[in-house]
Curated annotation (Swiss-Prot):
Function: Could be involved in the regulation of nitrogen fixation.
GO biological process assignments: nitrogen fixation; regulation of nitrogen utilization
Database matches in Gene3D superfamilies: 3.30.70.120
SMART domains documented for this protein: P-II (SM00938)
Source organism, top-level taxon: Archaea
UniProt keyword terms in alphabetical order: Nitrogen fixation, Transcription, Transcription regulation
Name of protein: Nitrogen fixation nifHD2 region GlnB-like protein 2
A Pfam family reported for this protein in Swiss-Prot or TrEMBL: P-II
GO molecular function: ATP binding; enzyme regulator activity
């Protein structure tokens, strides 16, 4: 099993959710998060420039609101889910997001006590 964590633009969250549902992956968690990439957030240029260098630095280094999807799938579905997330979110611009894939050693369905890959299958149980 793998955990897929995708950090994406806020305006792409609904379409990402819709595509995952259409592909048969209805189980995921969405969180509101703040972050920034290598660009250190968006820089706003002011005309005229800000007279205080500290204020200018604060303006350029900020956190951007994002959405974080967490999806646990069996190994055979990782490529499909990752590809669908990329298709929806890739614009070619900085800030499109990141996807992380991690191993999951165990999953337990609290309601039934069931464990293993059966807890993350596509069928409704």
């Amino acid at each position: 099993m793998k955990e897929i964590t995708a950090i994406i633009r806020m305006n792409k969250a609904q379409r990402t959710k819709d595509v995952l549902l259409e592909c048969g992956f209805p189980s995921f968690t969405i969180r509101r998060v703040m972050g920034r990439g290598k660009q250190r957030g968006l820089c706003h240029e002011f005309n005229p420039p800000l007279p205080d260098p500290e204020k200018e630095a604060e303006t350029c280094i900020r956190f951007i609101p994002k959405r974080m999807f967490t999806i646990v799938v069996d190994d055979e579905n990782v490529s499909e889910v990752v590809q669908k997330i990329i298709e929806v979110n890739q614009t070619g611009n900085a800030g499109d997001g990141k996807i992380f894939v991690s191993d999951v050693t165990e999953a337990i369905r609290i309601r039934t006590g069931e464990s293993g890959e059966a807890t993350v299958n596509k069928e409704l149980v």
